[in-house]
Amino acid sequence: MLRTMLKSKIHRATVTQADLHYVGSVTIDADLMDAADLLEGEQVTIVDIDNGARLVTYAITGERGSGVIGINGAAAHLVHPGDLVILIAYGTMQDAEARAYQPRIVFVDADNKQIDVGHDPAFVPAFDIPGAEELLNPRIGAR
């Protein structure tokens, strides 16, 4: 049996730009793509924390170190700059692999800089990690 499992998640990133007239996709900082084990063209689900919108698109690599999370194409009608989003990728795997697989969960600060990487989708980093308090409200002191 094949199972579809959580493969990667970038948790509570801030949308930095939206371009309605781009052909589609989500632009993600190359550092975050690497941390989350996302490939150019990989399918991702975007969950907008602010308005509840959910959509499926594909990832394109943004400038390394820029913190860019750019919503492109028609999705820009649903997700806007400043919105908090969760970016999720799923993988299909055999049952045995699924039972042992550990997803990549990337936590970011208000500037979309990585502050932690883990494997437990229910875990929130300890507050002794610089920037972790922003996971509860990443807009603190950011805008």
UniProtKB/Swiss-Prot annotation:
Catalytically driven reaction(s): L-aspartate + H(+) = beta-alanine + CO2
Gene3D superfamilies in alphabetical order: 2.40.40.20
Co-factor note (free text): Binds 1 pyruvoyl group covalently per subunit.
Keyword Lyase annotated: yes
GO CC terms: cytosol
Pfam families registered for this protein in UniProt: Asp_decarbox (PF02261)
GO biological process: alanine biosynthetic process; pantothenate biosynthetic process
Pathway listed: Cofactor biosynthesis; (R)-pantothenate biosynthesis; beta-alanine from L-aspartate: step 1/1
Gene Ontology terms, MF aspect: aspartate 1-decarboxylase activity
PTM statement from Swiss-Prot or TrEMBL: Is synthesized initially as an inactive proenzyme, which is activated by self-cleavage at a specific serine bond to produce a beta-subunit with a hydroxyl group at its C-terminus and an alpha-subunit with a pyruvoyl group at its N-terminus.
Residues modified to Pyruvic acid (Ser): 25
PANTHER family per UniProt: ASPARTATE 1-DECARBOXYLASE
Subunit structure: Heterooctamer of four alpha and four beta subunits.
Family statement drawn from the similarity comment of this UniProt entry: Belongs to the PanD family.
Name the UniProt record assigns to this protein: Aspartate 1-decarboxylase
Organism: Mycobacterium ulcerans (strain Agy99)
Name of the gene this protein is made from: panD
